[in-house]
């Protein structure tokens, strides 16, 4: 997998080098086609890339939103189950600021989505802040909660080391 800088408004796009045509998959919410055990995005022609969540987290945490990602197969390497390896590799290179304002979504009113015993709620806030609580039936994981605020570049120390669980 190789990451290349892209011009403003390019977005985040995966290019499947193992496919000869219809091999570009844009990383946007409407292209998410599966979220069971990992996140998969697909284009209109059925080309897909899975296990994108750790790389996408690293890119978001490092404020990278215009990048071309060349990949030789249908899955992003899972590495150690966190995004820290991606962050460290990106930190070893240089990034460039683009001469254009970033497009940022601003939550203006409360939005809540519920599905069975699960829910998510977005609330207006001047900073990026996450509160979550999760309660698994397993005694191994059970109930957990966390409060995070992403400020002053703390993504690497406060989020990137978070591991997945099975």
Identify the role of each PLM range.
Residues 1-164:
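Short acidic-hydrophobic catalytic motif
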